[in-house]
């Protein structure tokens, strides 16, 4: 009887502990929020980089100097101009990557568009193409399959090879340390309907900011 009583008394504190308030658990981090914060952490800074992929199509860009400039940042829009130095020493400032937060709740995502301008600031016939994220991605990498608006534009302009495009962007936060990188990649896969595989990838060293370039054309 004493043993039974002791066992019962011994379990009461444990049961009482189980019935007490449980510590709150933190909600899992949203990868897209973390990606956005990482990109925003470089706002105002410019970085050098270059081509790292090896498609023959891009051979003329293999040694080209390249810069990105995380130029403007707010809660729902970030612009990143992409500058390429030509063989004649002049800079092509026609390209700006535009990231936008879209949707809410389960429908939330990130949109990537490519703003292409002529030197006089007017829009190129092929501009504002891109796509929206199809999943949460990771804190470091987000992918953007081509959207229908862009497919229609590519078909209208005779760029049928581009209708299976997938763009991906990788970024490390400013505090990531010695190996922090930004990467932009375009891929096409024959298995997904492309006429041939395509891989274009540029990378930029985020550990060493350089002087910011002039504004991209049209801005």
Describe every region a protein language model picked out.
Residues 14-17:
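C-terminal motif of bacterial Sec signal peptides marking the signal peptidase cleavage site
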Residues 19-21:
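Bacterial signal peptide processing site
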Residues 27-59, 184:
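Tryptophan-anchored aromatic micro-motifs
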Residues 61-92:
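N-terminal glycine/threonine-rich, aromatic-flanked beta-hairpin/loop signature
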Residues 125-132, 181-219:
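Edge beta-strand at a domain terminus
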Residues 100-158:
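An exposed acidic His-Trp-rich patch
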Residues 1-7:
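Bacterial N-terminal signal peptides that target proteins for export
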Residues 62-66, 91-96, 123-124, 164, ...:
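Short, surface-exposed coil-to-beta transition loops
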């Amino acid at each position: 009887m004493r043993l039974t009583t002791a066992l019962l008394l011994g379990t009461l504190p444990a049961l009482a502990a189980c019935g007490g308030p449980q510590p709150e658990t933190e909600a899992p981090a949203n990868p897209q929020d973390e990606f956005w914060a990482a990109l925003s952490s470089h706002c105002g800074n410019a970085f050098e980089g270059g081509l790292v992929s090896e498609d023959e199509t891009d051979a003329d860009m293999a040694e080209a100097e390249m810069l990105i400039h995380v130029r403007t940042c707010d809660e729902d829009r970030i612009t990143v101009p992409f500058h390429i130095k030509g063989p004649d020493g002049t800079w092509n400032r026609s390209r700006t990557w535009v990231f936008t937060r879209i949707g809410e709740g389960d429908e939330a995502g990130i949109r990537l568009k490519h703003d292409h301008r002529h030197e006089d600031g007017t829009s190129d016939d092929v501009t504002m193409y891109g796509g929206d994220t199809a999943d949460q991605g990771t804190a470091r990498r987000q992918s953007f399959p081509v959207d229908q608006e862009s497919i229609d534009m590519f078909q209208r302009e005779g760029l049928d090879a581009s209708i299976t495009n997938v763009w991906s962007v990788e970024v490390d936060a400013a505090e990531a340390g010695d190996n922090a990188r930004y990467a932009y990649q375009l891929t096409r896969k024959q298995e997904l309907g492309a006429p041939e595989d395509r891989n274009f990838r540029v990378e930029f060293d985020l550990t060493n900011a350089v002087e910011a370039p002039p504004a991209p054309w049209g801005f």
